[in-house]
């Protein structure tokens, strides 16, 4: 999709998402410090990449605007599993996608994937990640 929006740093909270170095990240911690009598407050944002799991941190004035990804959360069915990719089909549009196992599948569910099950996947900035296995009726 490639969709993103701008949000003021002072509005960000832990658990929300931000784009750092063109990587969508989940915010883990925000520390705001006032530098002194003159100057604006600065926010130190620590975040973990959704796709690569790397910890990133940035320091920005609280009045600055940062990019925030728009994440589409959708349901798909696993069609096929190869040694390095998973093929999934969207349950609404019936589009099929090839998702690399190393960067596109959450570590916790990698061993539980099998053909025919429904999964929740996130699509953002033109990339896809399978986040969790959905139960019956979800």
Curated annotation (Swiss-Prot):
Alphabetic keyword roster: Cytoplasm, Hypusine, Initiation factor, Protein biosynthesis
Described function: Functions by promoting the formation of the first peptide bond.
GO molecular function, one term: translation initiation factor activity
Bridged cysteine pairs (disulfide): none
Biological process terms in GO annotation: positive regulation of translational elongation; positive regulation of translational termination
One Pfam family here: IF5A-like_N
Gene Ontology cellular component terms for the protein in this record: cytoplasm
Domain of life: Archaea
UniProt-listed InterPro entries: IF5A-like, IF5A-like_N, NA-bd_OB-fold, Rib_uL2_dom2, Trans_elong_IF5A_hypusine_site, Transl_elong_IF5A_arc, Transl_elong_IF5A_C, Translation_prot_SH3-like_sf
Keyword Protein biosynthesis tagged: yes
Subcellular location(s) of the protein: Cytoplasm
Chain positions with Hypusine modification: 37
Record-given protein name: Translation initiation factor 5A
Gene source species: Pyrococcus horikoshii (strain ATCC 700860 / DSM 12428 / JCM 9974 / NBRC 100139 / OT-3)
Similarity comment: Belongs to the eIF-5A family.
Region forming the signal peptide: none
């Amino acid at each position: 999709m490639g969709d993103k929006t701008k949000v003021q740093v002072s509005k960000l909270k832990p658990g929300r998402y931000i784009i750092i170095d063109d990587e969508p990240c989940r915010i883990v911690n925000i520390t705001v410090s006032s530098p002194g009598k003159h100057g604006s407050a600065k926010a130190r944002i620590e975040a973990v990449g959704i796709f690569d799991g790397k910890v990133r941190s940035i320091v920005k004035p609280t009045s600055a605007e940062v990019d925030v990804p728009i994440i589409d959360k959708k349901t798909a069915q696993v069609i096929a599993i190869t040694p390095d990719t998973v093929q999934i089909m969207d349950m609404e549009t019936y589009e099929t996608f090839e998702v690399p196992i190393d960067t596109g599948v959450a570590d916790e569910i990698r061993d539980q994937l099998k053909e025919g099950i429904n999964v929740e996947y996130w699509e953002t900035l033109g990339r896809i990640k399978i986040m969790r296995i959905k139960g019956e009726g979800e």
